[in-house]
Amino acid sequence: KKRIDESYMLHGPYIKRIDDQTIEEGFFYFGLKHGRWVRLNRSDILQDKETYFMGWLNESIRFFWDPKKENLKEIIPIKYGEKNGMYYAFHLNGNLAAKGEYQFNNKIGVWIEYHSKNGKKKREIKYNKDPYNKNKTYISREWNLNGKLIYDRDLFLKKINK
């Protein structure tokens, strides 16, 4: 990760323009999208309108570990009434527990689980890239608590297919 000293956090109204044409408009709250955001094409025709709350789509479902709603448990991205977007789950200590992507209510791509104590990878689970492809889901890799690789499906398949 590279730190850029000359960068600033976006805070306040934001308008993205190409020449005098507004392409995107919204509001940043300490670097997070907040409130209503609109995207327009070059003919000023509305392409997309979304509402955010502190960086998350407003429809998204947020669960917390405590009644005061201070410790986030998971965020389920909801767009147009369906699970769409990046999913995040957190351990009680605040470390990331899992992340992956939903598309049309289906898990897609690689989902990663993390150990609670040190935040290192625990498991990679591969789902189909296409939500309508019904091939089987499988664990592609697994690590122990120290971060040592204990299972790699590709290496395993190479060994048994020799």
Each PLM stretch: what is its role?
Residues K1-K162:
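Glycine/tyrosine- and acidic-biased, solvent-exposed loop/turn segments at the edges of beta-strands
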